[in-house]
Amino acid sequence: MIKVAINGYGTIGKRVADAVAAQPDMEVIGVSKTSVSAEAYIAKERGYPLYIADLGKKPAFEKAGIEVAGDVEAMLKAADIVVDATPGGVGEKNRPIYEKLGKKAIFQGGEDHEVAGFSFNAHANYNEAENHQFARVVSCNSTGLVRIIHALDQAFGVARVRAVMVRRGADPDDVKRGPIDAIVLNPASIPSHHGPDVNTVLPHINIVTLAMIVPTTFMHMHSIQMDLKKETTREEVLKVFENHSRIGLVRKTMGIKSNAQLREYTQDLGRPRTDLWENGVFEESVSILDGKEFYCFQAIHQEADVVPENIDCIRALMGTVKDPQESIRMTNEALGLVAIG
């Protein structure tokens, strides 16, 4: 069993912890929090040993009825690998600790590529991970882009990508962020950071991205245009998506035309935390013009799509499963991830 420490038990960390616990070849040996919070109570309910950075705060946790297993360094020493799910920028500060302890670690998309030196996506570059001490799972938006670009590049070749990210303003529980009544260019200059982030995994892809933030919390929405190298049809493209375990199709017959309706659908499916781990490509939007111009809309659940990637990254870094498709199958099966549509 791979012993996994989750350093940072927040939006991503709590999901990765549950995903690790569901795997047949992994176990959660601890999670970390900096202060008493709702997530700390969830960790207690899940039975995850809770570690804190500052043992001076231990009385506050104990007063709240939450047992502290020790400090974060003790958790790290007991682990085979660390998933660093701390806020953006904190992972960079944590890296020297992992280096000192000789631990493999996975960072999230909030960190720069240079923090790990290797950015990861299970379908695109799984086999390149094994000889690295560190890896970075690209951001939620970049994960969604890499999945769909890589799938079409493998099938038809991709000459060029132009994509617009319509980004949610905040996560549902993040009451400190906005906007409440505005559309904010993010940034006003072109490109946004998403294209260069995609290039850390798919360096050969010509991609330009634009982004804006809107007053919603449920998901991001992408408007994507690709120039393909080979002529194809809409039907052939849909077959590629149907055969991809992490690209779901929002069928026209579902009547879903918004992120809110899609979230309701995942809730009705009984998905944990209403998570959409896969891309949600709107079938009705999938178009091929003049044989080589591809268009679509896709929804990306910012809290969830990187979760299975973290699980595969654990196996890839540890070298325990050599075949990417086998790891992906194991991860999906344990999570109950059957792509919608």
UniProtKB/Swiss-Prot annotation:
Positions contributing to NAD(+) binding: T11, I12, G110, R168, Q302
UniProt-listed InterPro entries: DapB_N, GlycerAld/Erythrose_P_DH, GlycerAld_3-P_DH_cat, GlycerAld_3-P_DH_NAD(P)-bd, Glyceraldehyde-3-P_DH_2_arc, NAD(P)-bd_dom_sf
SMART domains found in the cross-reference section: Gp_dh_N
Domain of life: Archaea
Keyword Transport belongs to the record: no
Single Gene Ontology MF annotation: glyceraldehyde-3-phosphate dehydrogenase (NADP+) (phosphorylating) activity
EC number: 1.2.1.59
Recorded catalytic activity of this chain's protein: D-glyceraldehyde 3-phosphate + phosphate + NADP(+) = (2R)-3-phospho-glyceroyl phosphate + NADPH + H(+); D-glyceraldehyde 3-phosphate + phosphate + NAD(+) = (2R)-3-phospho-glyceroyl phosphate + NADH + H(+)
Alphabetical list of NCBIfam families matching this protein: GAPDH-II_archae, PRK04207.1
Family statement drawn from the similarity comment of this UniProt entry: Belongs to the glyceraldehyde-3-phosphate dehydrogenase family.
Protein name: Glyceraldehyde-3-phosphate dehydrogenase
Organism: Methanoculleus marisnigri (strain ATCC 35101 / DSM 1498 / JR1)
Gene: gap
